[in-house]
């Protein structure tokens, strides 16, 4: 899976790193292990390196160049002493062809580069993808041969020899190229910027590789969850298909019942329609006979009405002539009566005018008499009021005189003064008389 990630990243073989190797021991992994939590990978943190450095001194350049040349020689020796087996060569050849094919059509061969690492249970599960590979001609034949060779060897031995040797060769070639470029740069400009750039690029590739591993783990989990969802969806689909089949069978039964019912209804409707047509035909024949008789009656009635119409027309003409004569008579009489009534109306108008003048004179006389009567009444009212006033004044004067006379007598004023000698003898009588007078006044 590591090489698949590198090949998917479209990186050249020179930048593949060699710090992570794959070793498979024991039985192939199961789905339980894939569902577990992925193991944490130690990430080497490389400090930031400046892009440019100051040129080195000549002794340093010579010393470093000697060390690097010695390293290059050792790597070359390692290339010649490394054992290369047949399986390794064939795997490298197949890998190079797979890379070329993936460069042209990456989507059609997603599993070709990982076939040497896929265990047998996983290969059987991904069997539907193999027809896409076999149709590619000669490569498919070689692929099958290589697959047979791989499956004949133990899993640990095959994967370790092939993958490890390939990685060692790639790393050795990469280090040789980097060291050669560094030696050349030291000899030219006394700097080693190419080495720093290679390290920086390798660090970026390494981080990218870790990202690819994380995405691959996430993809595996998503695939497992999607497989579970697919199983659930298949179960639901099968249940739905079963229910739909039952529903279809029920509908078929209903359709058969409806067909039988419709056949019975069609027969009944056909018989009913034939009977209705026969009855309607009889009714139409009977109605036609009645209409013929009615037409004959109407023809005879029309002839009779035409004769009657002629007689009525002659009668109406005679009556019209009589009415015209009577109309002329009445018009003459109307003129005479109108003239006579007009004369009477004129006489009545003259009489009305004379009566109106007489009535106006009478109204004027009546108004004058009314005025005289009103004035007489007013005068009588005044005289009555005056008489009443005089009587009241007379009564008031009499009362006033009586009151004054009594006052003079009581107080002995004027001619009513009594002599002194008679006062003593007649004291008692005087008192009695005074009381009587007072009583009389009160009365």
UniProtKB/Swiss-Prot annotation:
User: What's a GO biological-process term for it?
Assistant: cilium organization
Tree of life domain: Eukaryota
Extent of Basic residues compositional bias: 431-443
What are the IQ domain coordinates in residue numbering? 393-422
Q: Which family does it belong to?
A: Belongs to the DRC9 family.
Keywords of the record:
Calmodulin-binding, Cell projection, Cilium, Cytoplasm, Cytoskeleton, Differentiation, Flagellum, Spermatogenesis
| Major site of localization recorded for this protein | cytoplasm
Which organism is the protein's source?
Homo sapiens (Human)
Q: Which GO terms describe its molecular function?
A: calmodulin binding; Hsp70 protein binding
The root-end lineage is:
Eukaryota, Metazoa, Chordata, Craniata, Vertebrata
Q: Where is this region: Disordered?
A: 1-34, 415-443
Q: Where is the composition biased (Basic and acidic residues)?
A: 415-430
**Protein's name in the database:** Dynein regulatory complex protein 9
Q: Is Cytoplasm given among the entry's keywords?
A: yes
Q: Which GO CC terms are listed, alphabetically?
A: actin cytoskeleton; cytoplasm; cytosol; extracellular exosome; manchette; motile cilium; sperm flagellum
């Amino acid at each position: 899976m590591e090489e698949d990630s590198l090949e998917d990243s479209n990186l050249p073989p020179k930048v593949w790193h060699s710090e992570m190797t794959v070793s498979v021991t024991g039985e192939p992994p199961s789905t339980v292990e894939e569902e577990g939590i992925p193991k944490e990978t130690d990430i080497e943190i490389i400090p930031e390196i400046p892009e440019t450095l100051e040129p080195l001194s000549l002794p340093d350049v010579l010393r470093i160049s000697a060390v690097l040349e010695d390293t290059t020689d050792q790597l070359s020796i390692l290339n010649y002493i490394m054992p290369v087996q047949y399986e390794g060569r064939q795997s490298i050849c197949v890998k190079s062809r797979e890379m070329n094919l993936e460069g042209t059509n990456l989507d059609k061969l997603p599993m070709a580069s990982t076939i040497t690492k896929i265990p047998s249970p996983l290969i059987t599960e991904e069997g539907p993808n193999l027809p896409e590979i076999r149709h590619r001609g000669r490569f498919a034949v070689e692929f099958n041969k290589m697959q047979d060779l791989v499956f004949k060897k133990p899993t640990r031995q095959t994967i370790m020899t092939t993958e490890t040797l390939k990685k060692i060769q790639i790393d050795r070639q990469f280090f040789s190229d980097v060291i050669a470029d560094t030696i050349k740069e030291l000899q030219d400009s006394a700097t080693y910027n190419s080495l720093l750039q290679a390290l920086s690029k390798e660090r970026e590739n390494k981080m990218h590789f870790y990202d690819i591993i994380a995405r691959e783990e996430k993809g595996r989990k998503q695939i497992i969850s999607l497989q579970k969802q697919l199983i659930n969806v298949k179960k639901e689909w099968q249940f739905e298909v079963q229910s739909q089949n039952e529903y279809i069978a029920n509908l078929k039964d209903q359709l058969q019942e409806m067909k039988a019912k419709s056949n019975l209804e069609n027969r009944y409707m056909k018989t009913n329609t034939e009977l209705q047509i026969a009855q309607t035909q009889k009714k139409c024949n009977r109605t036609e006979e009645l209409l013929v008789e009615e037409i004959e009656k109407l023809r005879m009635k029309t002839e009779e009405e035409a004769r009657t119409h002629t007689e009525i027309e002659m009668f109406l003409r005679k009556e019209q002539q009589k009415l015209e004569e009577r109309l002329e008579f009445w018009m003459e009489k109307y003129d005479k009566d109108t003239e006579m009534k007009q004369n009477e109306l004129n006489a009545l108008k003259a009489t009305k005018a004379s009566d109106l003048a007489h009535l106006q004179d009478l109204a004027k006389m009546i108004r004058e008499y009314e005025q005289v009567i009103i004035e007489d009444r007013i005068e009588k009212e005044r005289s009555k009021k005056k008489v009443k006033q005089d009587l009241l004044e007379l009564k008031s004067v009499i009362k006033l005189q009586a009151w004054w006379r009594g006052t003079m007598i009581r107080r002995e004023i004027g001619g009513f003064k009594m002599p002194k000698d008679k006062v003593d003898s007649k004291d008692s009588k005087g008192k009695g008389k005074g009381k009587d007078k007072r009583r009389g006044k009160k009365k």
